[in-house]
């Protein structure tokens, strides 16, 4: 089999029995010696065979009149896989997002490793100890200098590389091999399933929170909404794609999918609210992203006629100038809070009438608060230290446990139908023996 190299559309072609065929070792030829991203990426070559019409030898005049080279290249590129390489995982690891947090502890140098507690030696003070310490320090310095020289001879190349980053943070040197993310193959669905899924349906959105952690290595945390009637994407596929995108070991996909399935199983759809009736509740939000805390208190209509949690979160992020990571976090928190309030309202465990301090007894309007001027109804954005955040989390857990106890106590009280209690059929005349000693009688 003889090969005659030809250059049509900047692609190497071989002639076999006067038919154009791509060999498995196909490599595009460019003057700059760089692979075209649409033809080859990550050393993965498109190995499909493409047959073209017969043409004459490259030296014949018919080759010069051949004008189908652009169509030939277009036909090849249309069947090639796209986006085989991505720098998303590397950008996430730069620390500008809370989706992937690097929890590797910072190690101190050998000179500052030993921490001395001087409070233990306050009573045992002796001047001779300082002389012994000086001798020990001198011997330690000599031994350290000798060891540093030995290490410098062995790792001279590494030190030269580290010295290049004078005044900057040198990259960490790791001897661990890097594992590439496993390839994810697309799932093919029959045409009947796609036609069924194309019908417009009202989604039942469930707030999902996924958090996996490898101690002293990384922590992944994400918020999103999941359709209860989802049939295309399974939790296992979603977890596999997430691990591949973040370059996380594939073993954590089982933990992610288990968390999603658990939250989907715990979700129970609340009964529908009365139609044409506005159900107003007081919502208190507290969302923490990195070191920034967003708190807000507002009134919400559970009927959802005026706004959705997504629209509210988008408006808050734009008005307050928050980061884009607050959008899914606020949406998740608001969905979860509204679901709890809706169940509590149907169970009559919260007051039906909301005191929103509106003027003239209206359902909505300006709030009349002469003492605090509506301070509690204003959104707050604060940047806290880790100690303050830990203290706030403890207070939040304590308040949530208190609310659970109160709701359990309210659930034990039997429900009383007020309409039947005050109806005429239930009224009766009390005799004198049943009257109490109240002055009203």
Curated annotation (Swiss-Prot):
Keyword annotations from UniProtKB, A to Z: Cell cycle, Chromatin regulator, Nucleus, Transcription, Transcription regulation
Signal peptide (UniProt feature, chain positions): none
Gene Ontology CC: one annotated term: nuclear chromosome
Composition bias type Basic and acidic residues, residue spans: 138-147, 155-166
Chief place where the protein resides: nucleus
Annotated compartments: Nucleus
Pfam families hit by this protein: SNF5
Domain of life: Eukaryota
GO-annotated molecular function: transcription coregulator activity
Any one GO BP annotation for this protein: chromatin remodeling
Biased composition (Acidic residues): 124-137
Region (Disordered): 124-183, 383-407
Function statement: Part of the chromatin structure-remodeling complex (RSC) which is involved in transcription regulation and nucleosome positioning. RSC is responsible for the transfer of a histone octamer from a nucleosome core particle to naked DNA. The reaction requires ATP and involves an activated RSC-nucleosome intermediate. Remodeling reaction also involves DNA translocation, DNA twist and conformational change.
Protein family: Belongs to the SNF5 family.
UniProt-listed PANTHER family: SNF5
Name recorded for this polypeptide: Chromatin structure-remodeling complex subunit SFH1
Organism of derivation: Yarrowia lipolytica (strain CLIB 122 / E 150) (Yeast)
Gene it is expressed from: SFH1
């Amino acid at each position: 089999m003889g090969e005659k190299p030809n250059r049509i559309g900047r692609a190497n072609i071989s002639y076999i029995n006067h038919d154009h065929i791509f060999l498995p070792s196909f490599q595009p030829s460019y003057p700059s010696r760089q692979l075209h991203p649409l033809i080859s990426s990550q050393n993965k070559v498109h190995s499909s065979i493409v047959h073209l019409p017969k043409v004459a030898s490259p030296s014949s005049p018919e080759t010069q009149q051949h004008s189908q080279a652009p169509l030939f290249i277009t036909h090849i590129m249309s069947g090639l896989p796209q986006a085989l390489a991505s720098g998303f995982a590397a950008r996430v690891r730069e620390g500008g997002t809370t989706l992937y947090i690097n929890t590797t502890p910072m190690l101190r140098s050998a000179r500052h490793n030993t921490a001395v507690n001087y409070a233990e030696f306050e009573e045992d003070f002796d001047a001779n100890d300082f002389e012994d310490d000086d001798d020990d320090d001198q011997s330690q310095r000599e031994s350290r200098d000798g060891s540093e020289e030995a290490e410098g001879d062995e790792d001279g190349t590494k030190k030269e590389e580290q010295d290049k980053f004078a005044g900057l943070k040198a990259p960490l040197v790791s001897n661990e091999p890097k594992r590439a993310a496993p390839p994810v193959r697309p799932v093919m669905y029959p045409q009947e399933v796609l036609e069924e899924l194309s019908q417009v349906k009202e989604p039942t959105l469930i707030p999902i929170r996924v958090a996996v952690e490898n101690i002293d290595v990384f922590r992944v945390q994400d918020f999103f909404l999941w359709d209860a009637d989802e049939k295309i994407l399974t939790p296992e596929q979603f977890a596999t794609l997430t691990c591949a995108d973040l370059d996380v070991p594939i073993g954590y996909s089982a933990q992610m999918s288990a968390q999603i399935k658990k939250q989907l199983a715990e979700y129970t759809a609340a009964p529908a609210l009365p139609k044409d009736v506005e159900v107003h509740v007081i919502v208190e939000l507290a969302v923490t992203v990195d070191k920034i805390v967003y708190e807000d208190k507002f009134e919400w209509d559970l009927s959802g006629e005026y706004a959705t949690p997504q629209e509210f979160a988008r408006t808050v992020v734009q008005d307050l100038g928050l980061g884009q990571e607050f959008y899914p976090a606020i949406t998740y928190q608001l969905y979860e809070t509204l679901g709890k309030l809706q169940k509590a309202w149907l169970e009559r465990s919260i007051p039906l009438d909301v005191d929103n301090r509106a003027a003239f007894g209206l359902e909505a309007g300006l709030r009349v608060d002469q003492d605090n001027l509506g301070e509690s109804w204003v959104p707050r954005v604060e940047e806290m230290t880790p100690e303050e955040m830990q203290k706030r989390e403890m207070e939040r857990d304590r308040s949530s446990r208190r609310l659970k106890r109160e709701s359990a106590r309210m659930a034990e009280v039997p429900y009383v139908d007020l309409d039947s209690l005050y109806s005429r059929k239930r009224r009766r005349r009390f005799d004198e023996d049943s009257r109490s000693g109240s002055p009203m009688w």
